[in-house]
Regions:
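Extended, intrinsically disordered, low-complexity segments
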Residues: 16, 72, 76-99
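Active-site-adjacent beta->alpha loops and helix N-cap segments on the catalytic face
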Residues: 11-24, 45, 66-77
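Glycine- and other small-residue-rich loops at beta-strand/loop junctions that grip anionic moieties
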Residues: 11-15, 36-40, 63
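Conserved, mostly hydrophobic/aromatic
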Residues: 26, 50, 89
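Glycine/Thr-rich beta-alpha phosphate-binding loop at enzyme active sites
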Residues: 1-33
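Glycine-rich phosphate-binding active-site loops on the catalytic face of alpha/beta enzymes
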Residues: 40-41, 46-74
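Glycine-rich adenosine-cofactor-binding loop
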Residues: 27, 33-45
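Alpha-helical structural signal in soluble globular domains
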Residues: 25, 29, 53, 73, ...
Length: 99
């Protein structure tokens, strides 16, 4: 296939494990910087994985291309997950999940 910009990219679900590892390793080396987790987030559970790995915030990218309301759905799902697990919400608020 012909690729317009000569390089190809990887996005969506295939990036999730790479993104999670990058967030975790960055957090262990630089514990005080803000980190935005992105790559493969199409559900509240996957957003929670990034937060648990050490991200301060998450971004929904490719999923929004296929479903424009995906960011709102993911936020709602994440909110529901945290409401159902107050102990996890407290750990996230204290920055203790990735340790």
């Amino acid at each position: 296939p012909i690729i317009a910009n000569v390089t190809g990219g990887v996005s969506g679900p295939a990036v999730l494990p790479i993104g999670l590892a990058a967030v975790y390793h960055t957090r262990t080396v630089l514990p005080d910087i803000p980190i935005i987790g992105l790559g493969g987030i199409d559900s509240g559970e996957k957003a929670l994985e990034y937060l648990y790995a050490g991200a301060n915030a998450v971004e929904v990218g490719a999923a929004a291309l296929f479903d424009p309301v995906a960011p709102l759905r993911v936020a709602r799902e994440l909110d529901d997950l945290l409401d159902s697990r107050p102990e996890l919400a407290a750990k996230l608020a204290a920055g203790q999940t990735w340790r």
